[in-house]
Amino acid sequence: MSQLSFNEASLIYPARGRDGAAQLVLDRINLSVSTGEFVVVIGRSGSGKTSLLNLAAGFQEPSEGKVALDGKIIEGPGSDRAVVFQDDALYPWLDARDNVAFPLRIKGMGERDRRARAGELLELVGLPEAGKRRIWELSGGMRQRVGIARALAAEPRFLLLDEPLGALDALTRSRLQTFLLDVWRKSRSGALLITHSIDEALLLATRIVVLSPNPGRVAADIPSSFAADILAGAPASEVRASPAFKRMHDGLTGLIQAIGPEEELAA
Protein backbone atom coordinates (compact mmCIF):
# COMPACT_ATOMS: atom_id res chain seq x y z
CA MET A 1 0.00 0.00 0.00
CA SER A 2 1.27 3.46 -0.94
CA GLN A 3 0.49 6.67 0.92
CA LEU A 4 0.41 10.30 -0.15
CA SER A 5 0.84 12.51 2.91
CA PHE A 6 0.71 16.18 3.87
CA ASN A 7 2.55 16.94 7.11
CA GLU A 8 2.03 20.47 8.49
CA ALA A 9 2.07 21.67 4.86
CA SER A 10 1.52 25.40 4.33
CA LEU A 11 1.56 27.41 1.12
CA ILE A 12 2.30 31.13 1.08
CA TYR A 13 2.15 33.30 -2.03
CA PRO A 14 4.74 36.10 -1.86
CA ALA A 15 3.77 39.74 -1.74
CA ARG A 16 3.14 41.50 -5.05
CA GLY A 17 4.01 45.13 -5.55
CA ARG A 18 5.39 47.60 -3.07
CA ASP A 19 2.35 47.60 -0.79
CA GLY A 20 1.25 44.00 -1.29
CA ALA A 21 1.09 41.47 1.51
CA ALA A 22 2.01 37.81 1.42
CA GLN A 23 -1.02 35.51 1.18
CA LEU A 24 -1.35 32.39 3.31
CA VAL A 25 -3.27 29.99 1.04
CA LEU A 26 -2.97 26.71 2.97
CA ASP A 27 -2.25 26.55 6.68
CA ARG A 28 -0.67 23.49 8.33
CA ILE A 29 -2.45 20.80 6.34
CA ASN A 30 -2.25 17.31 7.82
CA LEU A 31 -3.81 14.75 5.50
CA SER A 32 -3.05 11.32 4.07
CA VAL A 33 -4.45 9.37 1.13
CA SER A 34 -3.70 5.67 0.67
CA THR A 35 -4.09 3.46 -2.38
CA GLY A 36 -7.59 2.00 -2.29
CA GLU A 37 -9.06 5.26 -0.96
CA PHE A 38 -11.09 7.82 -2.90
CA VAL A 39 -10.70 11.09 -1.00
CA VAL A 40 -12.78 14.06 -2.13
CA VAL A 41 -11.91 17.62 -1.05
CA ILE A 42 -14.69 20.21 -0.90
CA GLY A 43 -14.88 23.78 0.32
CA ARG A 44 -15.76 27.30 -0.69
CA SER A 45 -13.79 29.43 -3.11
CA GLY A 46 -10.60 30.55 -1.40
CA SER A 47 -10.15 27.35 0.58
CA GLY A 48 -7.11 26.30 -1.46
CA LYS A 49 -8.52 23.12 -3.02
CA THR A 50 -6.62 23.41 -6.30
CA SER A 51 -3.47 24.54 -4.47
CA LEU A 52 -3.68 21.36 -2.38
CA LEU A 53 -3.86 19.27 -5.56
CA ASN A 54 -0.93 21.20 -7.05
CA LEU A 55 1.19 20.30 -4.02
CA ALA A 56 0.28 16.63 -4.43
CA ALA A 57 1.11 16.75 -8.14
CA GLY A 58 4.46 18.46 -7.52
CA PHE A 59 3.50 21.56 -9.52
CA GLN A 60 4.23 23.64 -6.40
CA GLU A 61 6.29 23.05 -3.27
CA PRO A 62 5.01 23.84 0.24
CA SER A 63 6.36 26.97 1.88
CA GLU A 64 6.49 25.09 5.18
CA GLY A 65 6.03 21.45 6.14
CA LYS A 66 6.24 18.64 3.62
CA VAL A 67 4.30 16.62 1.08
CA ALA A 68 5.57 13.08 0.56
CA LEU A 69 4.84 9.84 -1.26
CA ASP A 70 5.74 6.77 0.79
CA GLY A 71 7.91 8.97 2.98
CA LYS A 72 9.88 10.51 0.10
CA ILE A 73 9.52 14.26 -0.35
CA ILE A 74 7.72 15.19 -3.57
CA GLU A 75 10.00 17.48 -5.57
CA GLY A 76 8.11 17.65 -8.85
CA PRO A 77 5.67 15.81 -11.12
CA GLY A 78 6.15 12.07 -11.53
CA SER A 79 4.61 9.08 -13.28
CA ASP A 80 3.47 7.74 -9.90
CA ARG A 81 0.85 10.54 -9.85
CA ALA A 82 -1.43 11.30 -12.80
CA VAL A 83 -3.46 14.51 -13.06
CA VAL A 84 -6.82 14.92 -14.81
CA PHE A 85 -8.09 18.49 -15.23
CA GLN A 86 -11.54 19.90 -16.03
CA ASP A 87 -10.14 20.73 -19.48
CA ASP A 88 -9.22 17.38 -21.03
CA ALA A 89 -5.85 18.75 -22.34
CA LEU A 90 -5.70 16.17 -25.14
CA TYR A 91 -3.67 16.59 -28.33
CA PRO A 92 -6.15 17.42 -31.13
CA TRP A 93 -3.77 16.33 -33.92
CA LEU A 94 -3.66 12.75 -32.54
CA ASP A 95 -6.42 10.18 -32.53
CA ALA A 96 -7.79 8.82 -29.25
CA ARG A 97 -5.52 5.76 -29.21
CA ASP A 98 -2.35 7.78 -29.78
CA ASN A 99 -3.39 10.26 -27.09
CA VAL A 100 -3.70 7.42 -24.59
CA ALA A 101 -0.41 5.89 -25.77
CA PHE A 102 1.56 9.15 -25.55
CA PRO A 103 2.87 8.65 -21.97
CA LEU A 104 3.99 5.15 -22.94
CA ARG A 105 5.91 6.57 -25.89
CA ILE A 106 7.75 8.91 -23.52
CA LYS A 107 8.62 5.90 -21.34
CA GLY A 108 10.16 4.18 -24.36
CA MET A 109 7.61 1.42 -24.91
CA GLY A 110 7.59 0.02 -28.45
CA GLU A 111 4.84 1.06 -30.85
CA ARG A 112 3.08 -2.30 -31.01
CA ASP A 113 3.02 -2.71 -27.22
CA ARG A 114 1.87 0.83 -26.50
CA ARG A 115 -0.93 0.64 -29.07
CA ALA A 116 -2.10 -2.64 -27.57
CA ARG A 117 -2.03 -1.13 -24.07
CA ALA A 118 -3.90 1.98 -25.28
CA GLY A 119 -6.56 -0.29 -26.75
CA GLU A 120 -6.95 -2.06 -23.40
CA LEU A 121 -7.34 1.26 -21.58
CA LEU A 122 -9.91 2.56 -24.05
CA GLU A 123 -11.88 -0.62 -23.46
CA LEU A 124 -11.58 -0.07 -19.69
CA VAL A 125 -13.16 3.39 -20.01
CA GLY A 126 -15.92 2.14 -22.29
CA LEU A 127 -14.58 3.41 -25.63
CA PRO A 128 -13.30 0.28 -27.43
CA GLU A 129 -14.32 1.59 -30.87
CA ALA A 130 -12.99 5.15 -30.47
CA GLY A 131 -9.28 4.51 -30.99
CA LYS A 132 -9.04 5.90 -34.52
CA ARG A 133 -11.33 8.87 -33.95
CA ARG A 134 -9.89 12.37 -33.74
CA ILE A 135 -10.39 14.27 -30.50
CA TRP A 136 -12.59 16.90 -32.14
CA GLU A 137 -14.98 14.12 -33.21
CA LEU A 138 -15.67 13.12 -29.60
CA SER A 139 -18.22 14.52 -27.16
CA GLY A 140 -17.10 16.22 -23.95
CA GLY A 141 -17.82 13.10 -21.91
CA MET A 142 -15.91 10.90 -24.33
CA ARG A 143 -12.92 13.26 -24.26
CA GLN A 144 -12.82 13.09 -20.48
CA ARG A 145 -12.85 9.29 -20.68
CA VAL A 146 -9.90 9.41 -23.07
CA GLY A 147 -8.13 11.78 -20.65
CA ILE A 148 -8.67 9.36 -17.77
CA ALA A 149 -7.42 6.46 -19.91
CA ARG A 150 -4.28 8.47 -20.70
CA ALA A 151 -3.79 9.21 -17.00
CA LEU A 152 -3.94 5.48 -16.26
CA ALA A 153 -1.45 4.57 -19.00
CA ALA A 154 1.61 4.94 -16.79
CA GLU A 155 -0.06 2.90 -14.02
CA PRO A 156 0.11 5.68 -11.42
CA ARG A 157 -0.30 4.96 -7.76
CA PHE A 158 -2.50 8.04 -7.38
CA LEU A 159 -5.05 9.80 -9.57
CA LEU A 160 -5.29 13.54 -8.91
CA LEU A 161 -8.55 14.92 -10.29
CA ASP A 162 -9.27 18.66 -10.46
CA GLU A 163 -13.03 18.93 -11.10
CA PRO A 164 -12.77 16.51 -14.05
CA LEU A 165 -16.54 16.46 -14.61
CA GLY A 166 -17.24 20.12 -13.86
CA ALA A 167 -17.63 21.26 -17.49
CA LEU A 168 -20.09 18.51 -18.47
CA ASP A 169 -23.88 18.69 -18.66
CA ALA A 170 -25.81 17.24 -15.71
CA LEU A 171 -26.82 13.98 -17.41
CA THR A 172 -23.31 13.21 -18.70
CA ARG A 173 -21.79 14.18 -15.36
CA SER A 174 -24.09 11.83 -13.45
CA ARG A 175 -23.30 8.95 -15.80
CA LEU A 176 -19.54 9.53 -15.59
CA GLN A 177 -19.55 9.67 -11.79
CA THR A 178 -20.47 5.99 -11.69
CA PHE A 179 -17.97 5.28 -14.46
CA LEU A 180 -15.20 7.05 -12.55
CA LEU A 181 -15.86 4.96 -9.45
CA ASP A 182 -15.66 1.77 -11.48
CA VAL A 183 -12.39 2.78 -13.17
CA TRP A 184 -10.86 3.74 -9.81
CA ARG A 185 -11.76 0.36 -8.33
CA LYS A 186 -10.30 -1.54 -11.28
CA SER A 187 -7.10 0.54 -11.31
CA ARG A 188 -6.44 -0.16 -7.60
CA SER A 189 -4.97 3.32 -7.26
CA GLY A 190 -5.63 6.03 -4.72
CA ALA A 191 -7.68 9.03 -5.78
CA LEU A 192 -7.74 12.66 -4.63
CA LEU A 193 -10.54 14.64 -6.26
CA ILE A 194 -11.43 18.33 -5.98
CA THR A 195 -15.04 19.44 -6.43
CA HIS A 196 -17.50 22.18 -5.51
CA SER A 197 -20.39 19.70 -5.51
CA ILE A 198 -21.48 18.17 -2.21
CA ASP A 199 -23.63 15.69 -4.14
CA GLU A 200 -20.63 14.53 -6.17
CA ALA A 201 -18.46 14.26 -3.07
CA LEU A 202 -20.98 12.00 -1.35
CA LEU A 203 -21.38 9.75 -4.38
CA LEU A 204 -17.65 9.26 -5.03
CA ALA A 205 -15.80 9.47 -1.73
CA THR A 206 -14.64 6.92 0.75
CA ARG A 207 -13.60 10.01 2.76
CA ILE A 208 -14.67 13.64 2.45
CA VAL A 209 -12.25 16.39 3.52
CA VAL A 210 -13.76 19.83 4.11
CA LEU A 211 -11.46 22.85 3.85
CA SER A 212 -12.26 26.16 5.51
CA PRO A 213 -11.38 29.30 3.50
CA ASN A 214 -8.82 32.10 3.77
CA PRO A 215 -6.55 30.37 4.60
CA GLY A 216 -7.37 26.78 3.74
CA ARG A 217 -7.41 24.51 6.77
CA VAL A 218 -8.80 21.01 7.29
CA ALA A 219 -12.13 21.58 9.03
CA ALA A 220 -13.39 17.99 8.84
CA ASP A 221 -12.34 14.55 7.59
CA ILE A 222 -15.42 12.34 7.31
CA PRO A 223 -15.82 8.73 6.14
CA SER A 224 -18.53 8.07 3.55
CA SER A 225 -20.07 4.75 2.45
CA PHE A 226 -22.32 5.76 -0.46
CA ALA A 227 -19.65 4.96 -3.07
CA ALA A 228 -19.47 1.41 -1.70
CA ASP A 229 -23.24 1.12 -2.11
CA ILE A 230 -22.99 2.18 -5.77
CA LEU A 231 -20.11 -0.19 -6.45
CA ALA A 232 -22.20 -2.97 -4.90
CA GLY A 233 -24.88 -2.31 -7.51
CA ALA A 234 -27.21 0.26 -5.96
CA PRO A 235 -28.45 2.80 -8.57
CA ALA A 236 -27.07 6.29 -7.92
CA SER A 237 -30.62 7.68 -8.08
CA GLU A 238 -31.71 5.43 -5.21
CA VAL A 239 -28.63 6.33 -3.18
CA ARG A 240 -29.36 10.05 -3.65
CA ALA A 241 -32.96 9.54 -2.52
CA SER A 242 -32.05 7.72 0.69
CA PRO A 243 -32.64 9.46 4.05
CA ALA A 244 -29.01 8.83 5.06
CA PHE A 245 -27.74 10.61 1.93
CA LYS A 246 -30.03 13.58 2.54
CA ARG A 247 -28.97 13.84 6.19
CA MET A 248 -25.28 13.83 5.32
CA HIS A 249 -25.83 16.31 2.47
CA ASP A 250 -27.62 18.69 4.85
CA GLY A 251 -24.91 18.23 7.47
CA LEU A 252 -22.10 19.06 5.04
CA THR A 253 -24.02 22.06 3.70
CA GLY A 254 -24.46 23.38 7.23
CA LEU A 255 -20.80 22.81 8.07
CA ILE A 256 -19.54 24.65 4.99
CA GLN A 257 -21.94 27.53 5.61
CA ALA A 258 -20.76 27.77 9.21
CA ILE A 259 -17.06 28.07 8.34
CA GLY A 260 -17.25 30.58 5.50
CA PRO A 261 -19.05 33.66 4.19
CA GLU A 262 -22.51 33.30 2.70
CA GLU A 263 -22.44 32.35 -0.96
CA GLU A 264 -24.15 29.86 -3.20
CA LEU A 265 -23.15 26.22 -2.71
CA ALA A 266 -23.20 23.63 -5.45
CA ALA A 267 -25.68 20.86 -4.84
UniProtKB/Swiss-Prot annotation:
Q: Which organism is it from?
A: Sinorhizobium fredii (strain NBRC 101917 / NGR234)
SMART domains in alphabetical order: AAA (SM00382)
Species classification: Bacteria, Pseudomonadati, Pseudomonadota, Alphaproteobacteria, Hyphomicrobiales
Q: What class of enzyme is it?
A: translocase
Function in brief: Part of the ABC transporter complex TauABC involved in taurine import. Responsible for energy coupling to the transport system.
Q: Which residues bind ATP?
A: 43-50
Its primary localisation, in coarse terms, equals membrane
Which Pfam families does the UniProt record give?
Answer: ABC_tran
Localization, UniProt: Cell inner membrane
Enumerate the catalysed reactions: taurine(out) + ATP + H2O = taurine(in) + ADP + phosphate + H(+)
What's the protein's topology in the membrane? Peripheral membrane protein
Q: Which UniProt keywords apply?
A: ATP-binding, Cell inner membrane, Cell membrane, Membrane, Nucleotide-binding, Plasmid, Translocase, Transport
Would you name any one GO CC term? plasma membrane
- The reply on keyword Endoplasmic reticulum is no
Q: Which residues form the ABC transporter domain?
A: 6-238
Q: What is its EC number?
A: 7.6.2.7
- The protein depicted here goes by the name Taurine import ATP-binding protein TauB
Family statement drawn from the similarity comment of this UniProt entry: Belongs to the ABC transporter superfamily. Taurine importer (TC 3.A.1.17.1) family.
Subunit record text: The complex is composed of two ATP-binding proteins (TauB), two transmembrane proteins (TauC) and a solute-binding protein (TauA).
Per UniProt, what is the name of the gene that codes for the protein in this document?
Answer: tauB
Enumerate the GO terms in the molecular function aspect: ABC-type taurine transporter transporter activity; ATP binding; ATP hydrolysis activity
Gene3D superfamilies cross-referenced by the UniProt entry: P-loop containing nucleotide triphosphate hydrolases (3.40.50.300)
